[in-house]
Every structure is written in structure tokens, then in C-alpha cells.
Amino acid sequence: MNLLDGKKCAESLVAEIARKVAGYTESGLRTPHMTIILVGEHAPSESYVKSKIATSGLAGFESTLLRFPETIRESELLAKIKEVNEDPTTDGLIVQLPLPKHINQQHVINAIAPEKDIDGFHPANFGRMTLGQKAFRPATAYGICKLLQFYEVPVKAKHCVVIGRSNIVGKPISIMLSNDFDIGNATVTLTHIETPRELLLDETRRADIVIVAVGIPGFVTADMVKDGVVLIDVGINRLESGKIVGDVDFENVAQKCSWITPVPGGVGRMTVAALMINTLMAYQNNFNLA
């Protein structure tokens, strides 16, 4: 069993970004700039934003955090997004999710200028990504691809099973791994909550790669996978004891894996690294550097 160490991979990617940024700024260009909008005081969101800001500094970026109370009206939030969209000194914009229930999340995503949508959630970017065109790719799914690429895990012609069909992970990673991207050309099966248990087991037991993102601790058990499987655990679940675990019964499943991501220390770090890659791409686009 080998660990797909997201921390090690992310540090390597961010260091490479920092080298590129140093070259750009030494030539007289301004520093790349990322803006994050945070609504309310959701503890996990606070933690994620803190990580993004810290990593942006390591990448050589400037970052701005715009905080708003949970009571902000949707119209006010959309107006602020429009303001950031029109700011030529901001390359990338993140609106930290989730949002309060009175704000329509899709309205907010759609309001972000596609050229600043470094989360890769805007329909224009998602559509281009689906068609295999250049676009900002959804960060968690992109981070998974970069992790597999970093460790030279074979993907082409492999059978990959994705458990979970969210717009953030399941759908985009299915598309990326099946498309002819820099990493891809896998045969992908997308499963979800309505997939019959027997069918799910039939698929996972034949899979070369299993990616799970369902938010259920220990969902993937040892009897569900074959020896030598590559297992990507996207889950982040806090138990009553306070321990953070993934969607995989790590202790019992790991011994069957050729590669597996730890939780924490796996996909989470890669999500942030992918955001940095997208921010650099937005910056390069602004200066016609790409």
C-alpha cells in the first residue's frame, strides 16, 4: 500500500506556481490577486478560507477577504460580486460555499464572471470542460487529477468507478477522467444514491480506481474492492469523538490498495492547490501569458 500524499503534491505544485509568479513580477507585472467572499460564520468555511489565504501567500499571490454577515440580502451579495467582476486588479473570485438558505446558490455562481471563476462552477466553464475545451476545472476534481498525475498512477484504459454525483466532485471527475485531457481516457462508471447496492458492488469489485464522495464515514469497506485498487477518498467527516475520517474504512481497506489517499492529508490539500493553478491561469489570461 502506498499513500497518495496530497500535502507533498500540493507543496510541489504551489512551489512551481511561486517560481512562475516570481518571474512575472520581476519582469514588471503586478502580483496575481485572488478575492474570497465569505458570508456568515460557518466554522468549516472559516477553516477552508484560512487555508486558501495561507496557500495563496505561498504561491506568491495577493488575497483579499470580503466578509459579510449571514443576514446579507441576495441582491446585496450579487452587487458585491458585480463590483469584484469589474475590478481589473482581481484575477480570481471565490464565493465560499455553503451560503445561507435565503440566498440562491446557483444565482451566486452564475453571477461570477466566467473569466474569474476559479472554482470552475460557472455553467460556461463546466460546459467548456465537458466539451474538452480550455476552461477552469472544478477544483476538487482537478486536484484529484493532479494527484494521480503527480504519482504517475495509470489512468488511461482503466476502469474507474465514481461514487457520488455532486456538481463539485462526482460529475466533473467522471467527465475529466473519461475525456481526452492531460490525464484521462479512462472508462468511467458514475454511481449514486439510487444505484442498487448489488450493482454498486458489482462495479466497485471490478474497478481499477474507486473515487468516493458521499459524506458517509466508512462507506467503502474491504469487501467492496479488489486487491490492488487505487482508492481516492474525498470524504471529510467529523465523528462525535472529534476525529476526522473519510468515506473509506481506511484501516481495513488500505491493505488491499496499491494507492490510497489519507484523510486528512489527501484530497483536501489538492483542492486548494487546484484553486492556485486556476488563479494563475486567470492571471496569465489577463496578461496574454498562456
Curated annotation (Swiss-Prot):
Magnesium recorded as keyword: no
GO molecular function, one term: methenyltetrahydrofolate cyclohydrolase activity
Residues engaged in binding NADP(+): 164-166, 193, 236
Pathway(s) it belongs to: One-carbon metabolism; tetrahydrofolate interconversion
Keyword list, A-Z: Amino-acid biosynthesis, Histidine biosynthesis, Hydrolase, Methionine biosynthesis, Multifunctional enzyme, NADP, One-carbon metabolism, Oxidoreductase, Purine biosynthesis
Enzyme Commission number(s) from the entry: 1.5.1.5, 3.5.4.9
Gene Ontology biological process terms, A to Z: L-histidine biosynthetic process; methionine biosynthetic process; purine nucleotide biosynthetic process; tetrahydrofolate interconversion
Reactions catalysed: (6R)-5,10-methylene-5,6,7,8-tetrahydrofolate + NADP(+) = (6R)-5,10-methenyltetrahydrofolate + NADPH; (6R)-5,10-methenyltetrahydrofolate + H2O = (6R)-10-formyltetrahydrofolate + H(+)
Annotated Gene Ontology cellular component terms: cytosol
PANTHER family the record matches: C-1-TETRAHYDROFOLATE SYNTHASE, CYTOPLASMIC, C-1-TETRAHYDROFOLATE SYNTHASE, CYTOPLASMIC-RELATED
HAMAP family: THF_DHG_CYH (MF_01576)
Function: Catalyzes the oxidation of 5,10-methylenetetrahydrofolate to 5,10-methenyltetrahydrofolate and then the hydrolysis of 5,10-methenyltetrahydrofolate to 10-formyltetrahydrofolate.
Assembly notes: Homodimer.
Family: Belongs to the tetrahydrofolate dehydrogenase/cyclohydrolase family.
Name of this protein: Bifunctional protein FolD 1
Taxonomic source organism: Geobacter sulfurreducens (strain ATCC 51573 / DSM 12127 / PCA)
Recorded name of the encoding gene: folD1
